[in-house]
Amino acid sequence: MPVRKQDTQRALHLLEEYRSKLSQTEDRQLRSSIERVINIFQSNLFQALIDIQEFYEVTLLDNPKCIDRSKQSEPIQPVNTWEISSLPSTTVTSETLPSSLSPSVEKYRYQDEDTPPQEHISPQITNEVIGPELVHVSEKNLSEIENVHGFVSHSHISPIKPTEAVPPSSPTVPVIPVLPVPAENTVILPTIPQANPPPVLVNTDSLETSTYVNGTDADYEYEEITLERGNSGLGFSIAGGTDNPHIGDDSSIFITKIIAGGAAAQDGRLRVNDCILRVNEVDVRDVTHSKAVEALKEAGSIVRLYVKRRKPVSEKIMEIKLIKGPKGLGFSIAGGVGNQHIPGDNSIYVTKIIEGGAAHKDGKLQIGDKLLAVNSVCLEEVTHEEAVTALKNTSDFVYLKVAKPTSMYMNDGYAPPDITNSSSQPVDNHVSPSSYLGHTPASPARYSPVSKAMLGDDEITREPRKVVLHRGSTGLGFNIVGGEDGEGIFISFILAGGPADLSGELRKGDRIISVNSVDLRTASHEQAAAALKNAGQAVTIVAQYRPEEYSRFEAKIHDLREQMMNSSISSGSGSLRTSQKRSLYVRALFDYDKTKDSGLPSQGLNFKFGDILHVINASDDEWWQARQVTPDGESDEVGVIPSKRRVEKKERARLKTVKFNSKTRGDKGQSFNDKRKKNLFSRKFPFYKNKDQSEQETSDADQHITSNASDSESSYRGQEEYVLSYEPVNQQEVNYTRPVIILGPMKDRINDDLISEFPDKFGSCVPHTTRPKRDYEVDGRDYHFVTSREQMEKDIQEHKFIEAGQYNNHLYGTSVQSVREVAEKGKHCILDVSGNAIKRLQIAQLYPISIFIKPKSMENIMEMNKRLTEEQARKTFERAMKLEQEFTEHFTAIVQGDTLEDIYNQVKQIIEEQSGPYIWVPAKEKL
């Protein structure tokens, strides 16, 4: 049945009549659905498609109306002629019209047949004035347009190029020829004169590509997210912009980190890799990074984000039965814990199907498939070695559980595999010699959306190739080795998420031939590093994949490292690149897990906050060799740890972020660390802390909120953040019992329990006061009563007190001498003081055992103290976090536990281990 515009209008009229009758509450959902359908009927795009359909059926398919080809060049009659110059026009971007025609995009509707459309503007996308449209439609024969919905779902609307529009001076347009349509670049389709709609320019020969990498609008979903700015800002980090694209040449603004506990995390809708289109009314497409940051900073307390994200790729789980042949299972794998094939994904992936093997003959397993299990052995969250072992230890009949991507699209970042033989280690028990079989194209049925980064070794050309990288805030995102005796410079590590990783063009084992035309074939390591460092923002690298050379080089380096370690243990000498070594003892000020450090050059060494490490070789800028020092002596195990420089560099990169909080009050030029020093050293009377000063200190943490971020992100911190790494220490013998300072939630109960359980080991000191003695009090037992206020103030100025305060116009304080008296009696003096007292005791040569109780969460605090309300627990948790931030380097140890008993037992153990007589104290030397 032919489509008529009158039929569309009648359907619209009937829908509107039916909608008006839906007045009951229970009809609300149905009414909303009908309104969406009405909006589609009234949209300008829908009207244009009806015009095309009607013209196609009424004019082109009607033989009497066919026009003689010989008259194609003649002007048509006025009824089919438009004056192009008089037509207003606008562009419709691909972002404004996703294929779903959802209400989140702009709606264009006619008020009646003869008037231009009115503006119906959604703030999500654009503020352009809407008029008659000039739109591109992707290449499609008109004969394929058999229904409107099918046409819409296969069309891509994109901005029209000015050079492709018909010049305004053209008085007429050529006649439309009879089907099939010749290959003219642009044709203009008139409609019947009764409707008189605006013209639609249909480009049948070209398609404007999307401004976004890897995918068209059909691959994305859109969402509006409203966030309320909290004390820590919006709680996410961004990267990208026209001046520093985050992924390839895509200038979009991407979400790179969601901060735990922040506004975005609490809302739960925003995701990493979401692309921000608008912030409130500000369009942040195709803007610089700083413009996007400014838009977020100036957005106010309620922030509306309009984002788009790639639709998730669904997976189909299936079981495949393979029968081993002479070539084994006949496929290769990559991935696993500690050896991720795709950044952020520990899964095991199929990277190669070997021709003639069991998998190839079966035909079901494809490159890009994810292996979930082999027989009854789970392959999720396992190492690469464990997966290989599981596959090799199978019988002749093997059952594979695999996850197959079911997405139908293939985009720029994906490619169908070429079936070639494997030069990498296949997963089978019979590895045949590698031989080149040529590039045999796979059948379409075997195409799968597998990333180019997932292809095997022999898909990588062995010829020199040119790669262009754009430097991120922390560099190019790869490590190099080599440069000795002209052996070449090789890439040894690709940083996940860095520029090199995101480009997908470099890999471990590449030899760097040149950097920005600087020949590095015979360069030393230092020369190569300098060339890369000074290469500027855009770096052109010529690289050649040489895995065999790199493997030989890596084996040699490993042998040298082993020799270095052995000689270091036996004689204390020997180094890879330096003959002189530094040896020192340090206290770790952070936890280190070697399994999470992918850049380790050799066997790593785990440690926790407060551990003492004997660094036996600190000659290298990036890595040190060390042994752990225990109460029983030094461990025999020698391992590699990150150097102070490396720790601080990585932590500063992690802390780089955009602060989306509002403008700070006062002292904007003064860093948090400056204030810490001022609070710690500059106050002559620390007890004189008025209300304003206290409020200012409380707000400091709020004004310097940071969040985790990735490489290519900006920092709006005023000054460089102080990073804790290692503290140099010396061993010292003490002839006193060390004081004990416990900080954090539940400290009072821990203190009381220690004195109650071990009254012979723990005690408290007698404080000083200028308050008059009461009748029942004894001087020296209850207080040391000071008759002269001036004298006590003088003693405070001379640092004879570790802490003092004022109450009811009387001074109270704890003197160094009072603490010393308890210590010399062989008891641990339990001190209820602030973190500032730790440093003052150290200056007085009374090194305390300072233990911080770090709560795991608000709920953890409420579980241990059930009398607290949620608000009290929240404030306690915040105070603890601020305490940790301010005094971490002065803590002897940090403890955490689920119960009070657990924490108490840890505290007792730490005090026992740290009691002496040999203790580690801060050294004066600098690292």
Curated annotation (Swiss-Prot):
Source organism superkingdom: Eukaryota
Membrane topology summary: Peripheral membrane protein
SMART domains to which the protein is assigned, alphabetical: GuKc (SM00072), L27 (SM00569), MAGUK_N_PEST (SM01277), PDZ (SM00228), SH3 (SM00326)
Domain free text: The PDZ domains may also mediate association to membranes by binding to EPB41 and ADGRA2 together with the L27 domain that binds CASK and DLG2. The L27 domain may regulate DLG1 self-association. The N-terminal alternatively spliced region is capable of binding several SH3 domains and also moderates the level of protein oligomerization.
Task of the protein: Essential multidomain scaffolding protein required for normal development. Recruits channels, receptors and signaling molecules to discrete plasma membrane domains in polarized cells. Promotes epithelial cell layer barrier function via maintaining cell-cell adhesion. May also play a role in adherens junction assembly, signal transduction, cell proliferation, synaptogenesis and lymphocyte activation. Regulates the excitability of cardiac myocytes by modulating the functional expression of Kv4 channels. Functional regulator of Kv1.5 channel.
Subunit-level organization: Homotetramer. Interacts (via guanylate kinase-like domain) with DLGAP1, DLGAP2, DLGAP3, DLGAP4 and MAP1A. Interacts (via guanylate kinase-like domain) with KIF13B. May interact with HTR2A. Interacts (via PDZ domains) with GRIA1. Interacts (via PDZ domains) with GRIN2A. Interacts (via PDZ domains) with KCND2 and KCND3. Interacts (via PDZ domains) with KCNA1, KCNA2, KCNA3 and KCNA4. Interacts (via PDZ domains) with ADGRA3. Interacts with KCNF1. Interacts with CAMK2. Interacts with cytoskeleton-associated protein EPB41. Interacts with cytoskeleton-associated protein EZR.
Protein name, per record: Disks large homolog 1
Annotated source species: Canis lupus familiaris
